[in-house]
């Protein structure tokens, strides 16, 4: 870039933008367009303006670095190279200078280092964040189409997810909380993998009970955790660590672990102090319905015995059901339901013994947090992709912001290669302001002679004509 033409480029882009806005306005009046079409036209125009501004700014920064005396003492100019980068505004292309260090002989693009652009980067971080944010809610293909104007592949989305890695919201803890009771709910999803097998991502969430917000019952201070492939003991050690980090354990009187009674969920009773199991009534009801599908008259009897905490009464009703069943297959179904209910009896009778028990909403949460993205449609995940997405889903539910996540250190950036001094920054801003103001004062579109849309608008304004 020639000396100090940065201001010329910026001003020319601004003039072009103004002229094109006038053209769009003319199309609106002459041809007509709806608000959606108008917004699309203006967005395309502002994206174009933004790309031009970014290219000009980067090349101006490159020029400032090149002319700096400090740079000349440490870095030797090798050549200039072009760089193409996909941004949220579309593709940009700029020229920057390649340098060799006088001290250790390494090579780098100082302006790229200053802007944290990696040597092999083809997509800027903002695009990657949008790709991942979109992918949390919808398919890789749809995500790639929404992130930026350029066409990106599904593999690009997966690469961005891999680059971010396993993310987790770390809550700032100023002081551990005091609560009488804690509630832990757990469930799992069943997700088909690309190799034909299934994986079971597990969801565990910890909360302090329910509270009313805007006329709805919501979980109080809920925190979600996702696990894919971890052993049950590792899951519960992690949950125990969360409780220890966030709560004064000596003040907790009761902890309820609620779920469908799966062994991995009951494993939590060994690791979480003061914990008791609570059976999810959704699954309890499912087995009652299953046992009484052919003899619904027994349904009320079973529920009466359950609600009274009468274990022997439950056994008696099931024995009657088994005798009444005519087919062996039906008998086995009833026996299975009986076994399930009796094996989880401690988690059933607690409802009648402890007024602080609030039940379990894990089935709804697993559907909303996991199934809606992971298993509702036949996607065929890789194990790696599934684990990363499960972590991202709970990251989002916990209020996480990918812009606040510290990504892995870039191996292709020479940290500290170059940094502008305050004096350089102040001088550059002063020069650009002064030069730009002078150029604006010298713009006389009305005297150019060429009748353009911007000429007509300015002339109309000057002579108070109606367009």
Swiss-Prot record:
InterPro entries: UPF0236. NCBIfam families: transpos_ISLre2 (NF033529). This is UPF0236 protein TTE0298. Belongs to the UPF0236 family. It holds the Pfam family UPF0236.
């Amino acid at each position: 870039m020639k000396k100090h033409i940065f201001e010329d480029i910026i001003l020319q882009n601004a003039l072009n933008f103004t002229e094109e806005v006038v053209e769009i306005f003319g199309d609106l009046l002459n041809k007509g367009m709806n608000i959606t079409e108008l917004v699309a036209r203006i967005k395309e125009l502002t994206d174009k303006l933004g790309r031009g501004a970014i290219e000009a700014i980067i090349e101006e920064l490159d020029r400032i670095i090149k002319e700096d005396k400090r740079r000349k003492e440490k870095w030797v100019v090798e050549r200039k190279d072009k760089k193409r980068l996909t941004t949220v505004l579309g593709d940009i292309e700029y020229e920057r200078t390649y340098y060799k260090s006088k001290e250790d002989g390494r090579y780098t693009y100082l302006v790229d280092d200053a802007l944290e652009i990696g040597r092999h980067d083809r997509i800027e971080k903002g695009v990657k964040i949008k790709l991942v944010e979109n992918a949390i809610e919808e398919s890789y293909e749809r995500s790639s189409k929404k992130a930026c104007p350029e066409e990106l592949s599904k593999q690009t989305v997966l690469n961005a997810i891999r680059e971010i890695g396993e993310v987790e919201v770390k809550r700032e803890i100023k002081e551990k909380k005091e609560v009488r009771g804690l509630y832990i709910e757990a469930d799992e999803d069943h997700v088909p993998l690309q190799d034909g097998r299934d994986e079971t991502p597990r969801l565990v969430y910890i909360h302090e009970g329910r509270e009313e917000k805007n006329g709805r019952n919501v979980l109080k201070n809920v925190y979600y955790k996702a696990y894919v492939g971890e052993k049950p003991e590792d899951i519960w050690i992690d949950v125990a660590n969360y409780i220890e980090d966030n709560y004064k354990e000596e003040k907790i009187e009761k902890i309820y672990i609620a779920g469908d009674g799966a062994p991995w969920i009951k494993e939590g009773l060994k690791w979480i102090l003061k914990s008791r199991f609570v059976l999810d009534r959704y699954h309890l009801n499912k087995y009652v319905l299953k046992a009484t599908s052919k003899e619904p008259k027994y349904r009320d009897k079973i529920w009466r015995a359950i609600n009274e905490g009468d274990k022997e009464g439950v056994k008696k009703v099931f024995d009657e059901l088994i005798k009444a069943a005519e087919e062996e297959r039906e008998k086995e179904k009833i026996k299975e339901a009986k076994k399930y209910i009796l094996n989880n009896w401690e988690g059933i009778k607690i409802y009648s013994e402890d007024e602080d028990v609030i039940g379990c909403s894990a089935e709804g949460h697993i559907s909303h947090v996991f199934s809606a993205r992971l298993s509702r449609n036949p996607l065929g995940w890789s194990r790696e992709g599934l684990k990363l997405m499960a972590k991202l889903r709970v990251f989002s539910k916990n209020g996480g912001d990918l812009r606040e996540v510290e990504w892995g250190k870039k191996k292709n950036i020479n940290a500290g290669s170059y940094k502008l001094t305050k004096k350089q920054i102040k001088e550059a801003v002063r020069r650009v302001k002064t030069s730009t103001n002078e150029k604006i004062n010298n713009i006389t579109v009305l005297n150019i002679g060429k009748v353009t849309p911007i000429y007509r608008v300015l002339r109309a304004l000057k002579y108070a004509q109606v367009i």
